[in-house]
Amino acid sequence: MSKLLKCEQTFSEADTRFYTQQVVEAVRYLHGRLIIHRDLKLGNLFLNSNKVIKIGDFGFATKLAYPDERRKTICGTPNYIAPEILEGKNGHSFEVDIWSTGVILYTLLVGKPPFQSKDVMSTYKLILMNSYDFPTEMTISSDAKNLTHKILQVLYNKR
């Protein structure tokens, strides 16, 4: 998907919806089997010839023993990492994949991740402050913006 984004630069809302829906279904499948991917990003989403997404690179994935289990491993890709992983206080669970899905959604619409910065520490600070905006020069519907805002909530229980 990252190669396709480089060619396209941004996706239409219809295409973004098409791909995001597939990511959500794949994440639902994983979570139903108590698997957290923990590194969802465009570079780990692969398209087949029918434009069907397959999730790859399960190197950071973990299988929980029970649904309420929480993990404390710090892992993921800086632009996509959830704030609760950075904070590390109460651990993390399925909600980190939801956060990353929101970052993917934004990235498809805008062409770059919402918290992208000049260096990793600045990116982490922006994530923890939930500091991002939609470019004013882009026409993005209020529905798409609202969905993104609902997913990219710092408090994981609000996602």
Residue ranges of model-derived segments:
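A conserved short helix/loop substructure at the end of the activation segment
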Residues: 152-159
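Conserved end of the kinase activation segment
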Residues: 85-95
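Activation segment signature within eukaryotic-like protein kinase domains
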Residues: 19-20
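AlphaC helix of the protein kinase catalytic domain
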Residues: 1-11
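Structural helix C-cap motif within protein kinase domains
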Residues: 110-113
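Activation segment
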Residues: 60-62
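Protein kinase catalytic-loop region centered on the HRD/HxD motif
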Residues: 25-35
